[in-house]
Amino acid sequence: MAEVRNYTFNFGPQHPAAHGVLRLIVEVDGEVIQRIDPHIGLLHRATEKLAESKPYNQTIGYMDRLDYVSMMANEHGYVLAIEKLLGIEPPIRAKYIRTMFDEITRILNHLLWLGAHALDVGAMTVFLYCFREREDLMDCYEAVSGARMHATYYRPGGVYRDLPDSMPKYKPSRWHNEKAVKKMNEAREGSLLDFIWDFTARFPNLIDEYESLLTDNRIWKQRTVGIGVVSAERALQLGFTGPMLRASGVEWDLRKKQPYAAYDRVDFDIPIGREGDCYDRYLVRIEEMRQSNRIIRQCVEWLRKNPGSVMIDDYKIVPPQREVMKRDMEALIHHFKLFTEGYIVPEGEAYAAVEQPKGEFGVYIVSDGANKPYRVKVRAASYPHLAAMNEMCRGHMIADLVAIISSIDIVFGEIDR
């Protein structure tokens, strides 16, 4: 009689549902998963080592490229750690701008996650809907920094510049005539804050649109309910954070428990799940988008009423304005020194963590008193979630593997670093 044994195969790294360069060695008994061994490192770019070889003010851009879907949230963790070492506090207006863009980033991340998750499970329409809204938010990035993705907008001591009075506008093309473009630009005639206010007024109805396609959909529930369950106790033991931990029923959010920026000044709720399965992770992230929308509206209201500085006034850390440099030799010298040598950070160690869309993103910096870090260690938010793949997938079907991978929201830029 022929011997019956388990079958082992590779899932990825060239797989449309691998979310990057994920390689899994999967052991199956028929269609049932017995064991999963994740292999990482295929997107390793030595980010931490690169940060040790450049001045502090030249390494902020590396953070954008870690989790390249949550760009400004990564920057926030890094600049908070530098600010701790320097002993500086950004102006309150800069804190509100950071809070607003952290939440814009959260919505950007969750929209991409929702579209990709739905596409992996078989619902293509949602993917197209989500990218429609992402375009508007990408334009907010472009308005403040000139870049749609890698913004480098946050700086130690504040933000690069104040919010602009105009928005990027669409132009007539082969695909859109002047009449269509005029309608598309209706919300873009005012300032960035006017555009964001208009977006946040429309967005709750758009979330309802996504939910009408998925939340009560019979096939969606069959693919996600009871799949990849992690209990609250086990989620804590595995080091889960963010939506993955909250979906298991643990009310933990750094924005509430360890407030930073202006989170102690805004009102919002922390959504939590009960079952800890793929469906609860979906529901938690959907509600997080609603709460982010709520926070953004509060920030817009405050920023409209309270003009002011967005950067500390210290030429040892912040470059002087161009107009000042033209008439002040000392300011010109400071500018030259900052962009050739950077600034000296006092000797010491600092850890700063932010509630990034995927979980707790932490940056630990060791300074030896030079103009560049002695050591930088990044805590990737989704690393512990990937490490739990074996536990979440065991006993499920191969088709469920795809649903579980997409539900944990992984990006290999930050996992491999």
From Swiss-Prot:
A cellular component term, taken from the record's GO annotations: plasma membrane
Keywords: Cell inner membrane, Cell membrane, Membrane, NAD, Quinone, Translocase, Transport, Ubiquinone
Catalytic reaction annotation: a quinone + NADH + 5 H(+)(in) = a quinol + NAD(+) + 4 H(+)(out)
Main enzyme class: translocase
Pfam families, A to Z: Complex1_49kDa
Keyword Transferase in annotation: no
Membrane topology: Peripheral membrane protein
Subunit (UniProt): NDH-1 is composed of 14 different subunits. Subunits NuoB, C, D, E, F, and G constitute the peripheral sector of the complex.
Stated role: NDH-1 shuttles electrons from NADH, via FMN and iron-sulfur (Fe-S) centers, to quinones in the respiratory chain. The immediate electron acceptor for the enzyme in this species is believed to be ubiquinone. Couples the redox reaction to proton translocation (for every two electrons transferred, four hydrogen ions are translocated across the cytoplasmic membrane), and thus conserves the redox energy in a proton gradient.
The protein's name: NADH-quinone oxidoreductase subunit D
Origin species: Coxiella burnetii (strain RSA 493 / Nine Mile phase I)
Source taxonomy: Bacteria, Pseudomonadati, Pseudomonadota, Gammaproteobacteria, Legionellales
